[in-house]
Curated annotation (Swiss-Prot):
Its EC number is 3.1.1.20. Belongs to the tannase family. It catalyses: digallate + H2O = 2 3,4,5-trihydroxybenzoate + H(+). One of its GO terms (molecular function) is tannase activity. It comes from the Bacteria. Activity is enhanced by the addition of 1 mM Mg(2+) (more than 100%) and by the addition of 1% glycerol (22%). Activity is reduced by the addition of 1 mM of various metal ions, including Hg(2+) (98%), Fe(3+) (95%), Fe(2+) (94%), Ba(2+) (92%), Ca(2+) (76%), Co(2+) (70%), Zn(2+) (44%), Ag(2+) (14%) and K(+) (8%). Inhibited by the addition of 1 mM DMSO (75%), Triton X-100 (42%), sodium azide (40%), beta-mercaptoethanol (34%), Tween 80 (22%), Tween 60 (20%), EDTA (18%) and phenylmethanesulfonyl fluoride (PMSF) (7%) but not affected by the addition of SDS. Monomer. The keyword Hydrolase applies. Optimum temperature is 40 degrees Celsius. Retains 14% of its maximal activity after heating 1 hour at 70 degrees Celsius. Optimum pH is 5.0. Active from pH 3.0 to 7.0. This is Tannase.
Length: 15
């Protein structure tokens, strides 16, 4: 599973 790196679903929470 890949971390959410999108400005749509999640706002770079796993940065």
């Amino acid at each position: 599973v890949q971390p959410p790196h999108s400005h749509g679903d999640n706002f770079y929470i796993w940065t």
